[in-house]
Amino acid sequence: MTATVYTFTDKPATVTHTHTASGKPTRTEMYTYSYNHADRLLKVEHTLGGTKITLADYAYDNLGRLQSKSLHGSATNKLTYAYNVRGWLTGISGTKFTQNLYYNTGNGTARYNGSISSMTWKAGNESTVRGYKFTYDGLDRLLNATYGETAGINANTDRFSENVTAYDKNGNIKTLQRYGQTAASGYGLIDNLTFTLAGNLLNRVDDAAAASAYGGGFEFKDGVKQANEYTYDSNGNLTKDLNKGISTITYNVLNLPNMVTFSDGSTIAYTYGADGTKLKTVHKTGSTTTTTDYCGNVVYENGVQKLLLTDEGYVTLSDSKYHYYLKDHQGNNRVVINQSGTVEETNHYYPFGGVFASSGNVQPYKYNGKELDAKKGLNWYDYGARHYDAALGRFTTVDPSAENYYSTSPFTYCLNNPLNYIDPLGTDTVDVKDVDWNKFDPKKDVVALDEVAVSVPNALTKVGTRALEPISGFWGYVGYYLLDIGSTYHSEQTRFTYKVGTDGVITGVAPMVGTPPLPGFAKTSNLNTIRGLWSLTKQGSSKVMKHPIRGLFYKSKSDGLWWVKDQTKHGGSFYKVYKETNKGLEWHKDADKYGNFIINKHKSDVGIFIPWKELSK
């Protein structure tokens, strides 16, 4: 049971959880939240068993950006954050974790489009500074992640490099090379993979690498040599993975796995709520059965309360000790410390999410903060709507928002740019620069509103500001709105209202009352009209047409203009906008990702006119 008390500005002041289970002790916990005058979170306190502690203290700079975070009320457990003039995160520094991000500076090839060109980090009790240099192709897909050590990323190079040497025309990885630890003091090529596909479906993977990862560490396991090592059902769900020894996978109506059966008789069974929330997993291997129950933020193992997940980490219920995550720019759990600041786990990640052989295994929440199920060599990350196989850089099932990503395979991870994007719930791709992952909790910061779900403002970083890329439903790629200070935004399609604080930061969502002044667009409560991007999907448009190369064109209900996602994004363009004529569609303007027309931008002859004969329903 959960009880919430709100402030006068609709922010949670206290949240009380009462956990009950038959035959188990009742546990009551309470979160207390404190805010500044701009409704920014200043402090989170946690009360368990009558004892109150400070989970985290937050401080902000003059632009409202997170400046520092102190864990467990200790300055020793403090992280500070640095930004460039564009507001992009450039550094995280603390005694147990440090990270530096470089865009157009540093040791890599300069990038001016916001993609990270190189990064360095130092984690836990290690003295080694590690790093990657990144190169991308013309579609901003990752090609090479070249590993090195020291601040110059020029020592012990290639020890943990990861390179995609070819993509197909749909964006599926065709060949991939991965380096790693092969012996106590040896390093080399551990994966040299060739993917065989039928369209977007994976048929087989061949590994030409001679060496294996040291100590059974992360790598692709080439278990068989057959023509069809992977099979799928009619919904595009993976039903067999012979390389992992999986003989069958069955699914429920939500395309979530019910049962994974291995060839040796071992099984993994899943139980979900009606909304797809995972409630239970049962792992059976031989005579050993491990049952994990997820009851809110309490995790039971074999009927015993094991973990209580908090805003900043977890509590081990056997001893009531607090443990904290130190996260990088993507929300990856890099270091786990206890309440005294002692390092308990250190994790290093390949770009596509695999963990180095030297990483720890104290707790299962790793890449993007997602639970890694490594039992029986499954090695899947649970993203909620889908599972992700980091060894292959692919999801195991089709993207639920596949109609909005017409130009790429529905199995790809983050448009093949895993350094600069993340997928919070397995349903959409989000630029990491738009979200403060140190404050984002997918269970608390995402609220379902009928057919859509949006991130609430706690996770937003920028003043002026925008909603997070849509998590699910019919918003498609859009979901960004420019809002005036002190205003509210009404949406007819989604039936809710954004409330905006005095600094322009969204402060809450609430059900929409009444009829918006202009359906499909936005209007602030103080009558200052703003342009709201309508849904680039069938539900949000009056007509949809398909082009064999450019994808889906959507006709606006309000002004009759046709919108299509710009696949090249040259000059900051996110959308091509066309006017309708008798003979076809004539280019009108380019628009940025907020829906604003780009002034004084000229169009080449390519795609300036689309005849009707090239479009189909």
Label the predicted regions.
Residues 8, 97-105, 109, 195, ...:
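A motif-centric feature for acidic-aromatic and gly/ser/thr-rich catalytic loops and repeats
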Residues 429-434, 438-533, 537:
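Hydrophobic, gly/ala-rich membrane-insertion helices/peptides used by toxins and envelope proteins
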Residues 340-354, 376, 384-386, 390-453, ...:
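Short turn/helix-capping motifs enriched in Asx and small/polar residues
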Residues 545-576:
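Amphipathic, interaction-prone secondary-structure segments
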Residues 1-16, 24-38, 42-43, 51-70, ...:
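Residue-level markers of secondary-structure register and packing in elongated scaffolds
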Residues 81, 85, 89-107, 199-209:
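Extracellular, surface-exposed repeat architectures
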Residues 579-617:
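Active-site or metal-binding loop neighborhoods of secreted/extracellular toxin and effector enzymes
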Residues 67, 108-118, 157-158, 207-227, ...:
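Surface-exposed acidic, glycine/proline-enriched linker/cap segments
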